[in-house]
């Protein structure tokens, strides 16, 4: 191990992953941002879904200061973060066949919308079926996953496929299988997961690309401001009223 303290080691590992995203995923980030900008310009709606801790990155996009107001959370009860007790139930729900179809049937998603599906492993039934079913509806799907899982783990979907196999675009988070960056001789398991910070940064890079792409086309991006700065509340009220038919968290 490095002579640096564990905190420094973890931060160095996270920085290394972020640099890899910047250098290796630049084209995919640009394509994803353009896809979202196209969706906004064409009157579509934006949605984000993640199960378990992957939901944290999805939630970070919704009703976010500096973020796109049109991004809505596609919530599945029991799998949004750790909102269910006992917590392992959420992991079990990710493996239930047919749950994704039931969710989409009761959601406002329609052809012409865009859906970000965030799943670190991309191997469970829920994200795989979510991507398959959404594309069948005519929804553009961007998958955010660690591609390494497809070569180092077995799919838990009956098709034997992974999230990455059913997307219009894939963003590879580069996270190692197991999601732990550090080891120690006195600790029997690897520790210090980096997927949340890295995936959130990856998605904010996509949002920044989408906003600037819209601006370059002469379209004001529908951005929210912080409610804790003067004028922020009034600004957000105006934006949400203007796009009220494409925002579902305000009702």
Q: What are these regions, as identified by a protein language model?
A:
Residues 48-207:
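Glycine-rich phosphate-binding loops that contact phosphosugars or nucleotide phosphates
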Residues 24, 28-32, 66-69, 212-251:
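Active-site phosphate/pyrophosphate-binding segments
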Residues 1-23:
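Generic N-terminal amphipathic, Lys/Arg-enriched alpha-helix
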Residues 24-41, 103:
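A short, well-structured juxtamembrane/interface segment
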Residues 44-46:
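Short active-site oxyanion
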Residues 5, 20-27, 91-94, 194:
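Short, surface-exposed alpha-helical recognition segments that flank or form part
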